[in-house]
């Protein structure tokens, strides 16, 4: 059996948005990370989602005319939590999520506010707002990913060539036969990607631009631990079952879950 050992600051299991965002953030803070994806393609469950991100008091909504207070955002979140969410964590989310959005924008990830919808989940409860607090990834061409274009999972259950805002404005998926056919054809030729797929592609582009190591077909078999603390993992590439690569983390192992 051939074996190899490598050391990183952060070892990330899974290439959905959590893994990609974690790798991007790690790099910006001067840490070396590696992403291990079990599947042959990138994206995890994120590519099958609409990729909406709820961020109260975000700068994109404010620039589009949304005026709201921190107290309103907190009231809405507390209503959604129903008393079952630790208030310190809830407050941290409300206070930090707008800055996290700005942080990833500075990293080159492009977002847009979703206009034309009221607040997500409930629109007439304490703290709710008539203007959407949701943002989505801007459309990105798959060709911007170079050789990685074909290595991102493309869903067949979500129309990714339109933004969520456009889909809502055009009457939803049931009205798809009446959408702008010329625009749809143009975007398909350009391989424009939005929603969860677009979100993954935006983050993957930023990660690849920074030289972060991304490995697919990595079947993680074992987590290494030292005094109860996870310190690394052992993976077996699907195409080379006789080769075991042990990846040791100097700081953290980040694992995502998929159903």
Each model region followed by its residue ranges:
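Short hydrophobic core segments
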Residues: 10-13, 220-221, 233, 245-250, ...
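A conserved short coil-to-beta-strand element within the FAD-binding core of flavoproteins
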Residues: 216-229
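N-terminal Rossmann-like FAD-binding beta1-loop-alpha1 element of flavoenzymes
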Residues: 10-35
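Loop/turn elements at helix/coil->beta-strand transitions in domains of secreted/extracellular proteins
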Residues: 8, 29-32, 210-211, 231
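Extreme N-terminal leader/targeting segments of oxidoreductases
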Residues: 1-10, 28, 240, 251
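Accessory "access/gating" subregions that flank catalytic or transport cores
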Residues: 3-5, 222, 234
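Acidic, glycine-rich active-site loops and adjacent beta-strand->loop/helix elements
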Residues: 16, 39-41, 220
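Conserved N-terminal/central alpha/beta ligand/cofactor-binding core
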Residues: 38-213, 237-259
């Amino acid at each position: 059996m051939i074996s190899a050992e490598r050391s990183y600051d952060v070892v990330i299991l899974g290439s959905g948005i959590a893994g990609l965002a974690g790798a991007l953030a790690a790099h910006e803070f001067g840490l070396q990370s590696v992403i291990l994806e079990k599947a042959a393609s990138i994206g995890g469950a994120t590519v099958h989602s609409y990729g909406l991100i709820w961020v109260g008091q975000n700068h994109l909504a404010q620039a589009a005319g949304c005026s709201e207070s921190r107290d309103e955002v907190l009231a809405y979140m507390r209503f959604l939590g129903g008393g079952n969410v630790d208030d310190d964590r809830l407050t941290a989310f409300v206070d930090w999520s707008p800055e996290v959005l700005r942080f990833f924008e500075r990293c080159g990830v492009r977002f847009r506010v979703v206009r034309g919808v009221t607040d997500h989940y409930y629109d007439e409860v304490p703290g709710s707002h008539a203007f959407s607090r949701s943002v989505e990834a801007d459309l990105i061409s798959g060709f911007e990913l170079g050789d990685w274009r074909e290595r991102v999972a493309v869903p067949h259950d979500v129309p990714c060539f339109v933004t969520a805002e456009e889909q809502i404005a055009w009457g939803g998926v049931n009205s798809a036969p009446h959408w702008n056919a010329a625009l749809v054809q143009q975007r398909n030729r350009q391989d424009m990607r939005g929603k969860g797929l677009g979100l993954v592609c935006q983050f993957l582009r930023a990660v690849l631009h920074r030289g972060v190591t991304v490995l697919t077909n990595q079947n993680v078999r074992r987590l290494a631990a030292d005094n109860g603390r996870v310190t690394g993992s052992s993976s077996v590439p699907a195409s080379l079952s006789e080769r075991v690569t042990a990846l040791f983390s100097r700081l953290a192992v980040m694992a995502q879950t998929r159903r």
